[in-house]
Amino acid sequence: MLRRLVQQWSVLVFLLSYSVPSRGRSVEGLGRRLKRAVSEHQLLHDKGKSIQDLRRRFFLHHLIAEIHTAEIRATSEVSPNSKPAPNTKNHPVRFGSDDEGRYLTQETNKVETYKEQPLKTPGKKKKGKPGKRREQEKKKRRTRSAWPGTTGSGLLEDPQPHTSPTSTSLEPSSRTH
């Protein structure tokens, strides 16, 4: 009885400690898959795109290898000094551009890649011309500050001049402002 109980417990502990695969993947693998960072997803996406691009290039290279060799043979038989007919143009035959797959679908038709413009150096900002309202306010302030006896004007007229030697003390009664 004890032996059977120990066997059942050991099997139970083994099954609980062993990670059961789910749909062919381990449980740890599923947990890791859910915790991937965005940068890791981008890296895997870029890696997949580059592998797909490489496979496509190999496929296209093997497909058009005979066409390239036939074109080279045909041009080598023509004399080097002969001129082409005036109505024909010698455009290189391109079956697929090297830029395919590197750009998004919106960018595939662009010939040049995006060039970054140089950054503007931060300089002094140009001050806008002050409006009429500001100029009028400045004029009012100037005229107010020129009036004698107003605070902030700097021109204070004392009704009694301080010429006596006793009025030089700093008593509050002798101050006028």
From Swiss-Prot:
Per the UniProt record, the source organism is Rattus norvegicus
Its keywords, alphabetically, are: Calcium, Cleavage on pair of basic residues, Cytoplasm, Hormone, Nucleus, Secreted, Signal
- Compartments it resides in: Secreted; Cytoplasm; Nucleus
Query: Where is the segment annotated Disordered?
Result: 74-177
Query: What is the protein named?
Result: Parathyroid hormone-related protein
What do we know about how this protein assembles, alone or with others? Answer: PTHrP interacts with PTH1R (via N-terminal extracellular domain).
State the signal peptide span: 1-24
* Polar residues composition bias: residue spans: 76-90
Q: Which gene encodes it?
A: Pthlh
Secreted: is it a keyword of this entry? yes
Chief place where the protein resides: secreted
Query: Locations of Basic residues compositional bias?
Result: 122-132
